[in-house]
Amino acid sequence: YRPFDTEDFDAIALILQQLWHNNSDNDEYNRLEAACDLAYCLSSSTFSQVAVIDGEARGIALARAGQNSGVTINEHWMDTERALLSQMRELEPDACAEYLSFVRATIRTNNRLLESSPLPHDNEVTLLAVDRDVHGLGVGTVLLDAAVSHLSSLGATRAHLYTDSNCSWKFYELHGFKRTATHRANREERRHDMPRESFLYELDLTA
């Protein structure tokens, strides 16, 4: 286990592609979409931990502590995200437009979830993804613990994350997170491939 290195990018993006970015018949487009998602997550995170097995990156946890993230790193990944979006538009304009609609709907939903909770808007686990081939080996637990420990070490009293009915939300409950808000997708949101239910989970770091 170690911090994210730029050389991990392609391997981690492939994990995200296999988990969440496989809607298009065009594999190259799916690859770009997953890479774009990863770049976005990296741009808004201040902590990273990667699981390396046999020299290969097989999982990642990202977290954001407070609002003062490193500007240079953020700008690099934001530029990367913009460049990937441009390639996506050229390759599959309709699929790209649908992806952007999904992203906007997700952001709106997450904001609604947070507004309905007394949580502060910082100290978030922004990404947790593990290669399906190593599920069940405890990799996700180590990565999540690393992210939460990092937030706690900086004085955070609570951490939060977003997940949904398409993901392994029970995993977070097993690790002490409690569901504090739920959003059920309406017909319009379902049309944009939004999950049936989206959840906000929080963890008390003082316990």
For each predicted feature, which ranges?
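Conserved acetyl-CoA-binding loop-helix of GNAT-fold acetyltransferases
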Residues: 130, 136-149, 174
